[in-house]
Curated annotation (Swiss-Prot):
The gene is trpS. A motif ('HIGH' region) lies at residues 14-22. One of its GO terms (biological process) is tryptophanyl-tRNA aminoacylation. It is found in: Cytoplasm. It holds the Pfam family tRNA-synt_1b. L-tryptophan binds at residue 137. Disulfide bonds: none annotated. GO terms for cellular component: cytosol. This is Tryptophan--tRNA ligase. Its EC number is 6.1.1.2. It comes from Rhizobium meliloti (strain 1021) (Ensifer meliloti). The keyword Ribosomal protein does not apply. A motif ('KMSKS' region) lies at residues 217-221.
Amino acid sequence: MNEFKPLVFSGVQPTGNLHLGNYLGAIRKFVALQENNDCIYCVVDLHSITAQLVHEDLPGQIRSIAAAFIASGIDPEKHIVFNQSAVPQHAELAWIFNCVARIGWMNRMTQFKDKAGKDRENASLGLLAYPSLMAADILVYRATHVPVGDDQKQHLELTRDIAQKFNIDFMEHIRRGGYGVDIVVGEEPIHAYFPPVEPLIGGPAPRVMSLRDGTKKMSKSDPSDLSRINLMDDADTILKKIRKAKTDPDALPSEADGLKDRPEAENLVGIYAALADRSKEEVLAEFGGQQFSTFKPALADLAVSVLSPITGEMRRLMGDTAHIDAILRKGGERARERAETTMREVREIIGFLQ
C-alpha cells in the first residue's frame, strides 16, 4: 500500500430523540459526504452505556437512528450502516488502545470532566475510556476523515495521538510485516499502519442551540421538550415550539454583527440559514428590521418543509422493524469483514498468536 485509501467514518449515539441539531450538525453532512466518498456510518450503541448503563428501549433507539440515517438520504447499499455492538472488533481494538493511551491523556479530556461532574470517583471506567473506544471505532477501518462537531474535536486529536504512538512503538513490526504506509508527522518520516485522521468540521449550523436558552446546546437530555425540535415531531408541534422559542424584544438586525450578545436571535437566524442553505447575512438582508412575530412563522414553515419528508419516512421505516434490522444486519456483516482485515494485521503486528 502506497497511501491510505480515503474513507469517511462517523457515528451517532442511540440516546434519546434525534433533534434538529443532530440533523443539521451531523446527519445532513453525512448525506452530502456520501456523494464523493466511501462512507461508514455507525449507531454507536457501546458508547450509549458509558454514562447510562440501563436503557428502557435500547433496540428502539438503535432502530430510530438507523431510520433517521436512511430517511435523510444515506444509501445503505452503496455505503455501510450498522450498529457498533454487532462488530466485536471495535471492543478488541479499544482494549489495545487502552494499553497504548496514557492515563494523563484521558484525564485531560474536557468532555469526561463535564459528564462526570463533581462526582468523578463515581463515573464509570467506560466514560473515562470513551475516547479510546472512539479511536478504535475510527481506526478499525483505518478511516482517514471524520465529520465531527467542536465538542468531539479534542477526542479526534486523541485518536491521532493514539495512532501515532502505535505507529511509532510498532514501526519495525509494521515494516517487517509489509503493512504500513510511509508518511511524515511534523518533520519526522514514519512507517505508519494507522492514518493521521483528519476532522471535517464546519457547515452553516454545526452548533444548534436550545430554543429556550440560546447559550446552551440543543440536547436530547434537556428536560424541556420545548427546547428542541425532534425529527419525529409533526408539523403542529414544530410550529408550536418555534412560536414559543425564547427571543428578545428587539427587531432583527440588518447585518450579522447586530446579532452579537443576542444568543436567541442568533440561534434562530442560524437555524433558518442552515435549513435554507443560505448565509446569515442573506437571511438578515431579507428579514432585517422585522419583528420575530413575522420571522418565526417563516422559520416554522421552512422547518416543516425540510423536516416533514424525513419525519414521514422515519415513521414508515419504524413501522417495519424487520426491514431496519435487515439493513443493520447486512451492514454489520460488511463492517465485520473490513474490521477483521485490520484486526488480523494488528494481532500480527503486536505478536498475538492466531
